[in-house]
Design a protein with these regions (language model features):
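ATP/NTP phosphate-donor binding region
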Residues: 1-94
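Structural motif
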Residues: 15, 37-39, 66, 93-96, ...
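Glycine-rich beta-strand-to-loop/alpha-helix junction loops that act as flexible
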Residues: 41-44, 98-100, 243
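Short Gly/Thr/Asp-enriched flexible loops that form oxyanion-binding sites at enzyme active sites
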Residues: 52-56, 83-84, 103-116, 158-161
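Glycine/serine-rich anion-binding loops at beta->alpha junctions
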Residues: 92-110, 150-156
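A glycine/threonine-rich phosphate-anchoring loop and its flanking beta-alpha core
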Residues: 116-223
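Active-site segments that bind and position negatively charged phosphate/pyrophosphate groups
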Residues: 213-265
Length: 265
């Protein structure tokens, strides 16, 4: 009898709402967690050029505590410190990230800062000599995170992040599985709020990775093969349509492809 390949598969649970008015489920999700002090993290463009922050505030009502609206590209360390300080001062018990890669990974580190209450430098992965990197065990509870995507990104369902230093030094890397999102939103209006150029650039990254993964499909187990094949199919069909500012379906499909890529790992 021919030997049967052995493999293991582990996945984290996440709730997901997609489509028209998907964001309307935000209040129900916050209520499910009994969250009373929701704090939003987003960038200046989302806060000033889209109605998303006002929409989230209206949906949450009294559960809305405040927002940090100055998160910059690549999640600078100083911005994350400021966001964590504001969230702590407002007693945040739920973090809502509105944006794409930079904001999503920054919010994870905000959660780490709130939970551990130590200098971020002490919580980062350490590299020494030629040995393997060592990630500190971050055991304290973390506030739950909701991710509201404005563009497709594989950062949507991760537990790690890297922050940029203001002095240009090595990035600070963090990992805590408790910072994986509880809920993800692919709301059509939120996704259409991003300019087509951003949708295309992020989508191209998702497609390129899907293409590379599909080329190595024979080495993968059956579950990974399925994820890779469908991620490639979704991204290949969505990519040519991302430039349409009125068509949300390819943006949703690209988000799905990016999520499947996470499950591939």
């Amino acid at each position: 009898m021919a030997p049967v390949e052995r493999f293991s598969s582990m996945s984290s649970g996440v709730r997901l709402h997609a489509g028209d008015d998907a964001l309307d489920m935000l209040a129900r999700e916050a209520q499910r967690l009994d969250a009373q002090r929701a704090f939003v993290v987003c960038g200046h463009s989302v806060a000033t050029r889209t109605p998303l922050l006002d929409r989230v505030r209206g949906i949450l009502g009294s559960r809305y505590a405040g927002a940090y609206t100055r998160m910059s590209k690549d999640a600078p360390l100083d911005d994350v410190r400021e966001a964590a300080a504001e969230a702590r001062a407002l007693g945040a018990d739920l973090l809502i990230a509105i944006g794409a890669g930079s904001v999503l990974k920054a919010t994870r580190v905000v959660a780490i800062a709130l939970g551990e209450d130590r200098p971020l430098e002490d919580l980062a992965t350490r590299y020494s000599g030629n040995g393997p990197p060592v990630s500190p065990r971050l055991l304290r509870p973390k506030p739950p995170i909701f991710n509201v995507l404005t563009a497709a990104t594989s950062a949507q369902d991760r537990g790690g992040a890297a922050l940029r230093r203001a002095d240009g030094g090595p990035r600070l890397e963090f990992f805590d599985p408790k910072t994986r999102p509880v809920t993800i939103f692919w709301d059509t209006a939120a996704l259409l709020s991003a300019p087509p150029s951003l949708a295309v650039s992020t989508g191209l990254g998702v497609y390129w990775r899907a293409l590379m993964n599909a080329g190595a499909i024979r080495q993968a187990n059956p579950l990974v093969q399925a994820a890779r094949l469908h991620a490639y199919a979704l991204s290949r069909h969505a990519l040519p349509r991302l430039a349409d500012p009125l068509d949300a379906q390819p943006r949703v499909d690209m988000c799905a492809a990016a999520l499947l890529q996470n499950r591939d790992e």
